[in-house]
Each structure stands twice: as structure tokens, then as C-alpha cells.
Amino acid sequence: MTRVFRVAFAGLVFVFALSGCVGPAPTTHTYESKAVRTANDSLSELQTVLLSVQMTRRGRMMQVYLETVLSESEDAFSSIQNTFDSIQPPDTGRADQLRAGLDTLLSDGADGLAQLRILARRQDTRELAAEAHKLTATAAALDKFAQEHG
């Protein structure tokens, strides 16, 4: 029984270790595909947040729910960003350009989401609207990135 338990435990550890790993992208095309998926996934989070801010400003969503949406979207966005950053790009200049371009957009998005969360908790609706407007530009840039490389 002890041996069976050890084998099962070792198998579970192996499965969990593999599930946290993201392998290298063997070609620039593969890397570009992963970058496009990342751009689309992160864009989705930004669109959710922007819609939530808009609905809250119009009185159609409670402030407490906005704060929840912002917090969860920020966590999801961070996970998307970390997953992309863990991918080993191929050794090409084009892959380096893709990474640099998308990383800038992801950083802008993460910063904007954090700022929105802070402003929402302070219930600063004027600044919240201004920050959401800035985040709209980041969302548009992510969409453009996905369209150009998709």
C-alpha cells in the first residue's frame, strides 16, 4: 500500500509540475500565434473592465460589483501576461520585436487595470472615467496587434 501511495503521489507531482510549464515556441510563426492569442485574451479582459466601468457610471452596475470585476480581471490579466512572458521565443529578430511590442501593451494594460481598481475603491468617478479612457487606447492597440499578426 505504501508503494502504491508513493507512485500515485509521484505521478500527481509530475502532472502538476507539467501543468505549470510553458514550453518554448519552436518557430517564429508559432510564437506569433501565441502572441496573437495573448493579445486577444488580454483584450477581452480590458473590454470587460471598460464595459463594467461604463455600466457603473450609468448607474446600471453597483460599485461593489465593479470592484469585484476589476479585481478578478486584474488577476486574469496578470495570469495571461505571466503565461506569455514564460514562453521562450525562438532566436529571431522578428520574435524579439513581437515580444517587445506585446510586452509594452501588456504592461500598459496591467498598470491601467491596477489604477482603475484603486480609483474604484476610492470611488473617484471622475478620475475613473479618465483612466478608463486611457485604457481604451491600450485596448485598441491590442486589437490592432492581434489584427496585424493574426
Question: Which residues are covered by each model-predicted region?
Answer:
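Short helix-adjacent coil turns
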Residues: 116-127
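C-terminal motif of bacterial Sec signal peptides marking the signal peptidase cleavage site
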Residues: 16-20
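Bacterial signal peptide processing site
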Residues: 21-26
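Alpha-helical segments in soluble extracytoplasmic regions
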Residues: 34-41, 45-110, 127, 134-148
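Bacterial N-terminal signal peptides that target proteins for export
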Residues: 1-11
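Core hydrophobic alpha-helical membrane-spanning segments
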Residues: 10-15, 124
